[in-house]
Amino acid sequence: METQIVEVIQFTDPVCTWCWGSEPVLRTLETRYGPQIKTSYIMGGLVKDIFSFYDSFNDIGGDPERSNRNIALHWLDASKRHGMPVKAEGFKLFSKENPSSYPQNIAYKAAQFQNEEKANRFLRRMREASAAEAKITSTTEVLLELASEVGLDIAKFLDDYTNGKANEAFEEDLYIASQYRARGFPSFLIKYGDKSMMLRGYHSYADFKSIISNLSKGELKELKVERNEESVLSFINKYNSAAPVEVKTAFSLSDEEFEKIESSMLKKQHITKQEAGNGYFLLPRVTPMVCDVETGVCSQ
């Protein structure tokens, strides 16, 4: 009998800081369970309008300038706990001209019409650009830039983004989120066969592992993951960028073990470091293109 897979569905928003903080957990799930798991996303629309939004605990909402200052402080505080990089300097996500996070949600739905894998890479880039690069990701210019980076067809993306089709798909996501009462993000729906469980808020990998074992009655087990340089390099190549905490979590590495592997890969020039706010990302080293000026042909 074919083994069932577990589905982990995240109710999310591209600019949600604890969704950003959950990236190490989701990547660890994908690494430890491999083909036994499928992750997907439902857009929840965190901020319809900053002027009518209000988070009393963090004093976010109303005036965009004050909100941006407090969001940056909140994200920095969260970063100390979840470990993902955040850039507070120059943070101006919301303004009179850009009062909502709905454009990012709709953009993800537009990307989904083309390719699920590229759409998820696009979602990751929106998270990185919002949290670690302090870019105003609600603008069409930035969204097109990010869509191009992940290989989406820009003409189709822009058409789907603006013709109402993606907005309709987003409205469907909002309805699904309301049916599951996913009002805070992240929230997770974990499904295995005809059984399911909702998790609300940030949760550790250990929590997910326990729930997967419970839902599958122990049938789904972690794969054997080698904790070595080759495996870490494969992980970085697969995801195209990884924060240190993502590597350490996925491979259960101590700080010392991680630093040893990182130092070796940097010395061998297998990877590069890219500074990002209060942290950095590890990227695969890409061989530069060489172009023949006569033929116009470029190759690596």
Set out the residue ranges of the language-model regions.
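Short active-site neighborhood of thiol/selenol oxidoreductases, capturing the structured segment around
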Residues: 4-17, 23-26, 39-45
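Generic detection of long, well-ordered alpha-helical segments
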Residues: 19, 65-68, 116, 167, ...
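A short acidic (Asp/Glu
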Residues: 20, 51-53, 199-201
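Extreme N-terminus of proteins, especially the signal/transit-peptide cleavage junction
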Residues: 1-6, 34
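Structural alpha/beta surface segment adjacent to cysteine/selenocysteine redox centers
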Residues: 24-134, 244, 298
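Residue-level marker of regulatory loop/turn positions in helix-turn-helix DNA-binding domains and
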Residues: 18, 96, 100, 236
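C-terminal cap of thioredoxin/glutaredoxin-like
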Residues: 10-11, 15, 23-31, 128-300
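A generic fold-level signal
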Residues: 3, 102, 182-183
